[in-house]
Swiss-Prot record:
Gene Ontology annotations for the cellular component aspect, listed alphabetically: cytosol
Protein name, entry field: Integration host factor subunit alpha
Keyword Transcription regulation carried by entry: yes
HAMAP family in UniProt: IHF_alpha
GO molecular function: DNA binding; structural constituent of chromatin
SUPFAM superfamilies: IHF-like DNA-binding proteins
Encoding gene per record: ihfA
Entry keyword annotation includes Protease: no
Assigned keywords, A-Z: DNA recombination, DNA-binding, Transcription, Transcription regulation, Translation regulation
Ranges annotated as biased composition (Acidic residues): 95-113
Record-linked Pfam families: Bac_DNA_binding (PF00216)
Region of interest (Disordered), residue spans: 88-113
């Protein structure tokens, strides 16, 4: 699905003009982008969490030459889906505890691969 598809869906479902639907979708994406640029977490109930993480610089290895190289510090974006979304993707079936907290703040291990 593309941004144009999302705009079309908003247009069809809400009844705004295509121009209004496009402006609303653009505003939502701009707000999300600006929030993430500030390093803030975005929590969307029933959907998931977007989290910006700072990764430290580290020494890596060139797989072709074996030479050690420095990998610079950077920010990475991770997404953690809510239990509601996970259940929806699995047809309402979950292998995790039913009724798990949707706003789980235990973020250990996310984006650290």
């Amino acid at each position: 699905m593309t941004k144009a598809d999302i705009i079309e869906s908003v247009y069809e479902k809400v009844g705004f003009s295509k121009k209004e639907a496009a402006e609303i979708v653009e505003m939502v994406f701009d707000t999300i982008k600006e929030t993430l640029e500030r390093g803030e977490k975005i929590k969307i109930s029933g959907f998931g969490n977007f989290i910006v993480r700072d990764k430290k610089s580290r020494v890596g290895r060139n797989p072709q030459t074996g030479e050690e190289i420095e990998i610079s510090a950077r920010r990475v974006l991770t997404f953690r889906p809510s239990q509601v979304l996970k259940n929806a993707l699995n047809g309402g079936v979950s292998d995790e505890t039913e009724g798990a907290d949707d706003d789980d703040d235990d973020e250990e291990g996310e984006g650290d691969e």
